[in-house]
Each structure stands twice: as C-alpha cells, then as structure tokens.
UniProtKB/Swiss-Prot annotation:
Record keywords, A-Z: ATP-binding, DNA-binding, Metal-binding, Nucleotide-binding, Repressor, Transcription, Transcription regulation, Zinc, Zinc-finger
Record region (Disordered): 1-21
Protein's gene: nrdR
Zinc finger (unnamed): 3-34
Family per similarity comment: Belongs to the NrdR family.
Organism: Prochlorococcus marinus (strain MIT 9301)
Record note on cofactor: Binds 1 zinc ion.
A Gene Ontology BP annotation from the UniProt entry: negative regulation of DNA-templated transcription
Bias-annotated ranges (Polar residues): 1-11
Function in brief: Negatively regulates transcription of bacterial ribonucleotide reductase nrd genes and operons by binding to NrdR-boxes.
A GO molecular function held by the record: zinc ion binding
Name under which the protein is recorded: Transcriptional repressor NrdR
A family per Pfam: Zn_ribbon_NrdR
Length: 159
C-alpha cells in the first residue's frame, strides 16, 4: 500500500479489524520510510450486475437509485435512515446472490415490494403506487384490500 505522504510502497500493518458489518477489513498501517500512520480498507470486489430494462436497454445496477426510491417511499414513516440503509443492503445482497450477471428491472421491483410488504405497509403502498403505475383510487383500494386480506391470514395462522 502506498504511503499518502511519501508514496513509499513499504508499510507494516499495526492493527486489523472487521468493519462495515464484516464486509470489509480496516487496517492501520505505518510507512516504513517516513513512519506516517494511515488507515486502509479492504473489500471484496463484487461482479457487476446488469439491469435489463423494460425497453430492452441494459445498465449497471445502481445501489443509489435503489436507495433513492426506497427513501421516498419511506418518508414520514417509522423507518429510520439506518433501517433504510440496512434494507437496501439486504436487497442488494439478494440481487448479487440470486443472479449471475443480469437481472430484469421487474424482478428488482417485485423483490423490493415483497420485502417492503413485510417491513412497512405505508412504504409498500407508496412504492407500489409508483412501481405499478396506479391510475386511480381503485388501484389503491385493491392493493389495500390485498394487504388487509394477508393481515387476516397472518392473524389466523398465529391463533
């Protein structure tokens, strides 16, 4: 690792520890030339995932787009910023684990809906209204009724 002050490539590791919930390793280093101490992070390089759009085009998976869409759906709900980040990380992990290189945008949308439904019904309705392009009140009512029906089924299975 190159020293940020003298650009020497020889350094020794003083300390290593897991960081970012085990997704990276934080290393404290010391330059053998100038004794400057600095921190580096080591992460696994993931294979890029391509998203196949409805119009047939292809683009690289963008975690920020996912975060933005879910954040909008979760505005003014009890979802904290940290919970949204964890939710997005979970969706990203599922996408990376379940796909080789390509995933349809519709699969991502359905995966988000499936997970949002379990976490927060308001965020689910908001996301569904945009993703499924609700045209009117009837679309909201039918989605609310399906939520209401699944809630009754869950209560019946608990009893």
């Amino acid at each position: 690792m190159q020293c940020p002050t003298c650009q020497n490539t020889d350094s020794r590791v003083l300390e290593s520890r897991s960081a970012d919930s085990g997704k990276s390793v934080r290393r404290r280093r010391e330059c053998l030339n100038c004794s400057f101490r600095f921190t580096t992070y080591e992460r696994v390089e993931s294979m890029p995932v391509s998203v196949l759009k409805k119009d047939g085009s292809r683009e690289l998976f963008d975690k920020q787009k996912l975060f933005t869409g879910i954040s909008r759906a979760c505005e003014k709900t009890n979802f904290s910023s940290e919970a949204i980040i964890n939710f997005v990380d979970g969706i990203e992990s599922q996408i990376v684990q379940d796909t080789n290189k390509d995933i349809k945008s519709s699969q991502i949308g359905e995966l988000i809906l499936k997970n949002l439904r379990k976490e927060n019904e308001v965020a689910y309705i908001r996301y569904a209204s945009v993703y499924r392009k609700f045209n009117g009140v009837k679309d909201f009512i039918s989605t609310l009724e399906s939520l209401k029906g699944s809630s009754k089924n869950q209560l019946a299975s608990i009893s």
